[in-house]
Curated annotation (Swiss-Prot):
Interacts with SKP1 and CUL1. InterPro entries: F-box-like_dom_sf, F-box_dom, LRR_dom_sf. Residues 1-47 form the F-box domain. Signal peptide: none annotated. It holds the Pfam family F-box-like. Substrate-recognition component of the SCF (SKP1-CUL1-F-box protein)-type E3 ubiquitin ligase complex. Mediates the polyubiquitination and proteasomal degradation of CAMK1 leading to disruption of cyclin D1/CDK4 complex assembly which results in G1 cell cycle arrest in lung epithelia. It comes from Bos taurus (Bovine). This is F-box/LRR-repeat protein 12.
Length: 326
């Protein structure tokens, strides 16, 4: 019977990659060969530190000993709900990430207090920045700040960031490389603020507006006015009507449209009305309807038959992927 000793290094590395960071370091003590494998650059491309209460001293050790130039994606948590005496993410740590991890492209911060961490301290190599349940200051994304900050940033995800408001949205215009914006539960953003923000972010190619207080109709109206080159739209159907959906008709570059439930709006367009609007979108290749309760129903048959050039996906809301770096 085969044992671990019989497995090739490539298989062992694949197995080790599924281990939490703490266990990964522990197995390096098993033998010299495993220690060498744990030091492999491939194993430290994507690191998830949200599973632990990570003290700054430990974080600094990991940064110096294991991550450095190997790191491509980092997911880490803060101590937002742990009291005033809990250690917080610091500007010094963010600057060290930028200096010691020149290949870091994606940074995901969870439950972190960033009020005292200026955006200027974040690694300038970032292409994707995700904030999940984080606290930011009013000045964090102020429009008048240094326009050279994060020059490569292409995607920003703002998920349940309660302080995020219209002024922050307008401050995103400094990121000239930005192509993808995700707003999740950002309840302080108003319809007027979204319209003004998108007017200056007219180079966006992907926009997601999920679980916000904005109606789907007002969101689509702002998109149709300002984002003529948008390729992917994903939004919650709250407040969606057939006239609201019709403003997307003729969108020249739209390739993917995703509408998410739950179905709570009485004005929700019928499958026939959705079909009529989609037929006017020349480049539409993906239509996705999630959580509307239409899976296996007549609606799915109507849309699939009427859009033979499209991939029509009708399904329940999926569970969140554990592959956070994808």
């Amino acid at each position: 019977m085969a044992t671990f000793a019989d497995l090739p290094d490539s298989v062992l590395l694949e197995i080790f990659s599924y281990l939490p960071v703490r266990d990964r370091i522990r197995i390096s003590r098993v033998c010299h060969h495993w220690k060498k494998l744990v030091d492999d650059r491939w194993l430290w491309r994507h690191v998830d530190l949200t599973l632990y209460t990570m003290r700054p001293k430990v974080m600094w050790h990991l940064l110096r000993r294991y991550m450095a130039s190997r790191l491509h994606s980092l997911r880490m948590g803060g101590y937002l709900f742990s009291g005033s005496q809990a250690p917080q993410l610091s500007p010094a740590l963010m600057r060290a990430l930028g200096q010691k991890c020149p290949n870091l492209k994606r940074l995901c911060l969870h439950v972190a207090n960033l009020s005292m961490v200026p955006i200027t301290s974040l690694p300038c190599t970032l292409r994707t920045l995700e904030l999940h349940s984080c606290e930011i200051s009013m000045a964090w994304l102020h429009k008048e700040q240094d326009p050279t900050v994060l020059p490569l940033l292409e995607c920003i995800v703002l998920d349940r960031v309660p302080a995020f408001r219209d002024e922050h949205l307008q401050g995103l215009t400094r990121f000239r490389a930005l192509r993808s914006l995700v707003l999740g539960g950002t309840y302080r953003v108003t319809e007027t603020g979204l319209d003004m923000g998108l007017q200056e972010l007219n180079y966006l190619q992907r926009l997601e507006v999920l679980g916000c207080t904005l109606s789907a109709d007002s969101t689509l109206l702002a998109i149709s006015r300002h984002l003529r080159d948008v390729r992917k739209i994903r939004l919650t159907v709250r407040g969606l009507s057939a006239p609201g959906l019709s403003v997307l008709e003729g969108m020249p570059a739209l390739e993917s449209l995703c509408l998410l439930g739950p179905l709570v709006t009485p004005e929700m367009p019928s499958p026939q009305e959705i079909l009529a609007s989609c037929l006017t979108m020349p480049k539409l290749r993906v239509l996705e309807l999630q959580g509307l309760g239409w899976e296996g129903q007549e609606a799915e048959r109507i849309l699939s038959k009427g859009l033979p050039h499209c991939m029509v996906i009708v399904r329940a809301l999926p569970k969140e992927s554990m592959d956070w770096w994808m």
